[in-house]
């Protein structure tokens, strides 16, 4: 049953369950339930998962390091939905703490699948709106702003 086939109350319960499951995985240093949500075919389940990761990172300081470790692990996963959701989770964290997830964006920017690369652009846009600075990876000469991705150029689009 897809997310929006559920009633509003059931959706809220499902989001709460996703949050609890991911937090439990992080506390146990496991990834089974988180992986099932990150790889789910339903976009809204994946959205609930990446938003939960952002909330857990922000509200539970002792789990921050484990959260980043989980994202690092998932960033290398063979399933593009897992990698895409990982980028989106990094975007949730990057709104407040960009430096700790910048390397996740670096990896995703050169992913073989377009949905992962597109997630990088969308997530960095979200972060940029909050942190008010462009994302530029000097050594690779890659710049992303709120309007363009310029590979191999030092051109910056205006925001």
Q: What is the role of each PLM region?
A:
Residues 32-54:
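Short, contiguous, helix-prone interaction/anchoring segments in small proteins
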Residues 41-43, 78-79, 112-113, 146-147:
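Short inter-helical turns and helix N-cap capping residues of alpha-solenoid HEAT/ARM repeat scaffolds
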Residues 73-81, 117:
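Short, mixed-charge aromatic SLiMs
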């Amino acid at each position: 049953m897809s997310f929006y086939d559920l009633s509003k109350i059931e959706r809220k319960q499902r989001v709460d369950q996703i949050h609890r499951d991911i937090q439990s995985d992080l506390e146990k240093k496991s990834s089974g339930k988180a992986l099932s949500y990150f790889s789910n075919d339903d976009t809204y389940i994946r959205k609930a998962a990446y938003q939960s990761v952002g909330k857990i990172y922000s509200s539970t300081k002792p789990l921050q390091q484990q959260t980043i470790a989980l994202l690092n692990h998932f960033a290398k996963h063979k399933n593009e939905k897992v990698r895409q959701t990982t980028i989106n989770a990094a975007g949730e964290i990057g709104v407040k703490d960009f430096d700790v997830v910048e390397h996740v964006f670096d990896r995703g920017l050169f992913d073989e699948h377009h949905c992962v690369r597109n997630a990088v652009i969308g997530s960095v846009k979200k972060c940029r709106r909050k942190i008010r600075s462009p994302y530029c990876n000097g050594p690779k000469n890659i710049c992303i702003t709120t309007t363009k991705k310029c590979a191999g150029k030092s051109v910056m689009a205006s925001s």
